[in-house]
Design a protein with these regions (language model features):
Chain B
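Short aromatic-rich membrane-water interface segments that cap or initiate transmembrane helices
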Residues: 283, 321-333
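Membrane-interfacial loop-to-transmembrane-helix junctions in polytopic alpha-helical membrane proteins
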Residues: 278, 282-285, 326, 352, ...
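Generic detector of multi-pass transmembrane helix bundles and their immediately adjacent loops
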Residues: 303-306, 316-319, 331-500
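Membrane-embedded alpha-helical signal segments
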Residues: 1-299, 314-317, 438-500
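Functional cleft and adjacent loop/helix regions within the main domain
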Residues: 311
Length: 384, 500, 371
């Protein structure tokens, strides 16, 4: 028994002298980090961190630091704060536009190398510099701007309006041959942060900016979308007979001349797109998109009384989506970014040599795609 | 005979009454309690001696002295034994039987020149009446608890298990101050090896005295270095009879209000008879909650310490902010904070146990609410930790066995220290050590972690959860009983269609 | 040294536990790194490699069982003694002991490195070694019965980690498995060879066989064990291939651990930390069996008391943890263990089998001649 106790004592003495403490309240816990490249290839990082100080009720602070590497910049930022900045809780990584255009892989891979960094953090880019978004936002809102941007993105991801943009997703898609990642673009609207678009990458370089609605189109090919609200403009022409005229209290069309479009709001309750390679030599693809939509709102009193009008509505929505997809593809081919993953499909069908990135970059602008959109109008709400 | 030098074993009879008086007075010279009265009856000298407070005086007078002295009979030992209508008459010749007999409430009668003393049993044992259980309180089911009187306890057990199959063996242990111990089991059920082991351990026990059955347990358990109790001690007769009927062995001890049950497994300590009285589908979750709370009680506070000291990454951001804010002003590292609070809880519990019930409750409120709030406001502890500590303290009190509950509560301290030194790795090290320890333990030579290891799938149904009675037609297989079938399995109900 | 081992009845174990013995020996730290190793050889056809490897393991296992069946109740040391005689047999048995030592050392170092990379970069090898070795000593002191209990209980308790893989499994990109059948045959074999370190461990059968009570169940139990471990390795590899892109997977040292990084719950943000800690429950049984194999073999071959070997070996290993701090040094130990084990576990039984059969036939003939 005595032997055991002595052993235990020696044991605990050795143990106590081993792992340095990293107590929560002595750390500055980085929540959001912005990265910009300044002149002379120096990295400027803007850090929003939590620090818990009994004297100071304000728990978020922002600091900036400049350095040659991102870790160096963090060290540099550390001189401004009395807490040790630590990266284990980074939830959002924001890259300035110029930085993203030069490529962000080097920054991302430093993140991955550190096992303590979370893989689920969000990756976003800003249309100005990251520093500006974070500091202006912070001053304007006087709360944790990082949190706000995160919830903005998370909300949209939950609605499937934009594709998932966690670090793991971004890296995985970036590293896949024949597919390119996208990331939301955060800008300032009335000096408040907002999602202003979606950035298309070619490998790890930002090459173009897409409209936020186009993000949904991309997302249908990446995942099964559910419950996404969406505004669609349809030509008014086919519906004139079915628009209820409030003034005349009849189905007579109103004055036509000033209106060309009818805008409806739908909720896409289910959506799924898949790509098949029709002809491997011509690089001809077929992309089928199936959407189930519920009608929520329309800009005019549209009365959906019978099957016929529903069919017209479906057809017009299909047409509109097809047009949008064609526009999207043209734009993507122009900037040589392939977020829909045509290259991935091509790779799985290609025999022999493995597909290389450069090979696909050459082929991509020449591919042709037939988009077939199939819309099922499921519900119309409580009124007809 | 006289040559035998050992005083207590010499046979002194026959002798004169006065000689006997001298002898008895010298034996009891330091405690002048012996009542020694001499009577002349039909020309014979009769001495009646006893210790007054050990006997019931009016019964002695009515049942023994009156018939003895008012009769015209010429008394001899045989005449007394034959004529006096009492059933406990015995003859003693040796001093080492007479002296303990006096202490055990016997009245001795000696007729001059006879070769032996006649004794009758008039024990007057002061005892409290049967009361409800205090430490192991139950909501439904029988509530009486054992008392300090062995006879009463045996009476209760006998009345619970009304079969001649019940064996109650008597063993006396303790050299200086002997105590009676009873080994109770069902002859047709209990495993012979287990009974032999238990009997042997009791017989071979070579100690001066044993204070209580909880002490007895420590003398005879398998591994005295372990923190876990290896035999179950309970104050519920209900529970004891349940265990005996399951084929286990119980040990009752004079002057001890708790019974030992052996062999016990780790899981049996979390078993309450209430689980039986509840229906199976409400009993099983309750037992599951007890297992869960044991785990929570051991792991929750260490997890907090580990997360706050080393692994802030695993805390979700929102929780991190509130933990961080509450930790902000605390001047100690989390380990000391946690140890301090755990110590406070232990203080409260200990004070509550010592103080009278009503004061104890007040102390609980003062300690828990007032000191807790003040500690948080003074900034020496964080309020989130107080929540964790309270939950784990509560959880540790759910164990139906007080001994096991205490073991689990004490286990937290080394776990907290390990968590404070090596974080999650330390906790896992502690858990691994604990499980290996449990695997190494035995109770009466049977694996402590049974029926998990060695695995007995049929026993899981009783040890970990309960199924409807129809599924419990077997007794514990791991106990290797003589008869492991409780009842023949009822035939499956005929399958009926709807509306038939 | 007798060829056949007499085991007291209370030391006997059921063949049922053989499943847990073999699984806990096979599934250890090896499975964490195996996806990368196989993938870098066989690419998306890794599953074929693993199936090939599993089939080969089953063949080896059947050969081992055939060898053991030729004797009443012998273990590998008794067989060595019988086939090679006193001195040569001792040499072969010593190689076996060395193998246990090296395997123990490699498992120890790998787990320490995982902890250092994922949880505590600053922890010293010595402290981690002290923890694991004290667990080993404590467990081995309990004897084979307790060690098997540990492998059983820990084996059951550690399984909940598998549920954490559901989340990454839902994010699999099935295109990563396509196109099928691209890897040349040589690469497939290379991929199969890369799993050898992971699949090691079933050789413990050579030692525990005499302890088993119901010998008729040995075959089914051990085959199920090997199948289950192969399934685990296969699904871990497939998950990693589906989850990571090729480029990522080739660079991730412990891809399986990274899979856990994406799972989060409202009360726990990061599960990889908990999984690394929980891995101790996976590693300790292997350590216990390897240490037990070492001490028991020493007793069988050299008649050294098990306790003595245990304490001496523990001290040597503890000192040994000082010397391999760097990643590539650890890798060298693992590679050495792998090379060593490959010839010894996967090839050697096929050398032994004909010798045993030959010897038996000779004996029979002799027996027939004399009678």
């Amino acid at each position: 028994m005595i032997k055991k106790t002595i052993l235990l004592l020696i044991f605990s003495v050795i143990l106590t002298s081993c792992v340095p403490y990293k107590q929560l309240e002595e750390l500055g816990i980085i929540n959001t980090r912005g990265v910009d490249v300044t002149e002379n290839n120096r990295v400027e990082t803007t850090i929003i961190a939590y620090q818990f100080d009994a004297q100071n009720p304000q728990i978020t602070t922002s600091t900036t630091g400049v350095g040659k590497t991102i870790k160096g910049a963090r060290e540099n930022a550390g001189y401004n704060t009395n807490f040790e900045l630590s990266p284990g809780q980074i939830r959002l990584e924001l890259y300035g536009k110029e930085t993203a255009e030069e490529g962000i892989l080097e920054y991302l891979s430093t993140l991955v190398r550190d096992a303590r960094v979370s893989d689920t953090m969000l990756v976003a880019i800003s249309n100005i510099t990251a520093n500006e978004v974070l500091t202006v936002g912070q001053e304007e809102l006087n709360t944790d701007v990082g949190q706000i941007i995160q919830s903005l993105i998370e909300k949209e991801v939950k609605e499937y309006s934009i594709p998932k943009t966690s670090l793991q997703h971004f890296l995985h898609i970036e590293a896949d041959i024949g597919q390119d990642p996208v990331a939301p673009i955060i800008g300032l609207r009335n000096n408040k942060p907002a999602i202003v678009g979606i950035g298309a990458f070619s490998n790890d370089r930002l090459v173009g900016e897409l409209h936020i609605d186009q993000a949904f189109l991309i997302n249908t090919f990446l995942t099964n979308v559910k419950g996404t609200p969406m505004e669609i403009s349809l030509p008014r022409e086919p519906f004139v007979d079915f628009i209820f005229n409030n003034e005349t209290n009849s189905m007579q069309p109103d004055k036509l001349e000033d209106k060309e479009h009818l805008t409806i709001l739908v909720r896409i309750s289910k959506g799924k797109g898949d790509i098949t390679l029709k002809n491997i030599d011509d690089l001809h693809f077929e992309a089928n998109v199936h959407l189930e939509v519920d009608l929520y709102e329309s800009s005019e009193l549209l009365s959906v009384k019978n099957k016929k009008i529903a069919a017209i509505l479906e057809e017009e929505i299909e047409k509109e989506f097809k047009r949008q997809y064609d526009v999207l593809l043209a734009k993507l081919q122009e900037i040589d970014s392939d977020p829909l993953g045509f290259g991935g499909i091509y790779r799985t069908k290609k025999k022999g040599e493995r597909l290389t990135d450069t090979e696909w970059r050459e082929k991509y602008p020449n591919i042709t795609v037939d988009f077939n959109v199939n819309v099922d109008l499921m519900h119309y709400g409580t009124i007809q | 005979m006289r040559k035998r030098m050992k005083r207590s074993s010499k046979n002194v009879f026959p002798l004169k009454i006065d000689e006997l008086e001298q002898l008895m007075k010298s034996e009891f010279d330091k405690s002048p309690d012996l009542s020694f009265s001499k009577y002349e009856h039909q020309n014979k000298k009769i001495a009646v001696f006893f210790i007054p407070y050990q006997v019931q005086p009016d019964r002695v007078e009515n049942l023994l002295l009156t018939p003895l002295l008012e009769s015209k009979e010429e008394w001899s030992n045989t005449a007394i034994l034959n004529k006096i209508p009492l059933n406990s008459g015995k003859e003693y010749q040796q001093m080492d039987e007479i002296l303990p007999g006096l202490i055990a409430g016997k009245v001795m009668i000696y007729i001059e020149d006879e070769a032996a003393v006649v004794s009758y049993d008039f024990l007057n044992k002061e005892k409290r009446s049967l009361e409800g259980a205090e430490t192991e309180s139950v909501v439904i089911g029988p509530k009486i608890a054992f008392t300090e009187s062995l006879v009463t306890n045996l009476n209760v057990i006998r009345w619970n298990i009304r079969t001649p199959d019940l064996a109650i063996e008597e063993i006396t242990i303790g050299k200086r101050a002997p105590r009676e111990v009873r080994l109770i089991y069902l002859k047709s059920l209990a495993n012979d090896t287990d009974v032999d082991t238990m009997r042997q351990r009791l017989n071979e026990l070579d100690v001066d005295n044993v204070e209580d059955s909880n002490v007895l347990m420590q003398y005879i358990e398998d591994d005295s270095a372990s923190i876990f109790p290896q035999f179950h001690t309970t104050e519920l007769p209900d529970r004891t009879s349940y265990a005996i009927l399951k084929g286990k062995i119980a040990v009752l001890m004079e002057n001890s209000p708790s019974a030992l049950i052996a062999p016990s497994t780790f899981f049996s300590f979390f078993e309450s008879t209430e689980d039986l009285y509840m229906r199976w589908n409400s009993g099983s979750p309750l037992r599951f909650i007890r297992f869960m709370s044991m785990f929570i009680s051991v792991v929750l506070t260490p997890m907090y310490v580990a997360a706050v000291t080393f692994h802030y990454e695993i805390i979700p951001t929102q929780l991190l902010i509130s933990i961080g804010q509450s930790r902000a002003g605390v001047p100690f590292p989390p380990v000391f904070e946690a140890l301090f609070l755990e110590l406070m809880i232990e203080l409260l519990r200990e004070a509550g146990a010592r103080l009278p019930t009503k004061v104890g409750q007040t102390i609980g409120i003062v300690g828990g609410v007032v000191v807790g709030t003040a500690a948080v406001q003074a900034g020496i502890t964080s309020n989130i930790l107080i929540i964790f500590i309270t939950i784990s303290a509560l959880a540790s009190f759910t164990a139906p066995s007080y001994q096991m509950g205490t073991s689990i509560r004490l286990l937290r301290f080394p776990m907290i220290v390990l968590a404070g030194i090596l974080g999650l790795i330390g906790i896992m090290f502690g858990l691994c050590m604990l499980i290996i320890h449990l695997l190494k333990m035995t109770s009466l030579g049977r694996p402590y972690l049974s029926p998990i290891y060695p695995i007995r799938f049929e026993d899981l149904n009783k040890a970990l959860y309960r199924l409807p009675q129809n599924f419990q037609y077997k007794r514990f297989i791991s106990l290797s009983l003589k008869d492991s079938i409780r009842f023949s399995k009822r035939n499956a109900k005929e399958k009926k269609d709807i509306d038939e | 040294m007798e060829i056949n081992v007499k085991i007291k009845p209370n030391m006997r174990i059921q063949a049922f536990y053989l499943f847990f013995i073999i699984v806990s020996m096979q599934i250890g730290v090896g499975i964490l790194g195996v996806p990368r190793l196989v993938f870098s050889e066989a690419k998306q056809d890794s599953w074929i490699s693993i199936l090939v490897a599993a089939a080969y393991v089953i063949i080896v296992l059947l050969a081992m069982l055939l060898i053991l069946k030729q004797y009443d109740n012998a273990d590998i040391h008794g067989i060595h003694r019988d086939i090679f005689g006193k001195w040569l047999g001792k040499i072969f048995s010593t190689v076996y002991i060395l193998y246990f030592a090296i395997a123990f050392y490699s498992v120890l170092l790998t787990y320490i490195e995982v902890v250092k990379v994922f949880v505590f970069p600053d922890v010293s090898n010595f402290v981690m070694g002290l923890l694991l070795i004290s667990l080993t000593i404590y467990g081995v002191l309990g004897g084979l019965r307790v060690i098997i209990g540990v492998s059983f209980v820990f084996g059951v308790l550690a399984n909940w980690i598998l549920f954490l893989l559901i989340h990454p499994a839902l994010q699999i990109d099935f295109n990563h498995y396509l196109p099928l059948f691209q890897a040349p045959f040589v690469d497939l074999l290379k991929g199969a060879r890369a799993t050898s370190y992971t699949f090691m461990g079933f050789e413990i059968l050579f030692l525990v066989y005499p302890f088993i009570q119901n010998k008729n169940k040995v075959r089914i139990s051990s085959l199920l064990a090997v199948t289950w471990s192969s399934l685990l390795v296969l699904s871990a590899t497939m998950l990693a291939i589906g989850f990571f892109s090729a480029e990522q997977l080739e660079r991730r040292e412990w891809a399986v651990l990274v899979l856990f990084k994406t799972q989060s719950f409202p009360f726990v943000e990061r599960f990889d930390y908990i999984v690394v800690a929980e891995l101790m429950m996976v590693v300790v049984p292997s350590l216990l069996f390897l240490m037990w194999g070492l001490t028991y073999s020493m007793k069988r071959v050299y008649k050294v008391k098990q306790k003595l070997t245990l304490y001496v070996a523990a001290i040597i290993f503890l000192i040994g943890t000082f010397f391999f701090e760097k990643h590539f040094e650890t890798q060298r130990v693992i590679n050495f263990a792998e090379q060593f084990g490959f010839w010894f576990i996967y090839v050697y039984p096929f050398v032994l089998l004909p010798l045993v059969l030959l010897k038996k036939r000779l004996k029979k003939r002799k027996g027939a001649g004399s009678s």
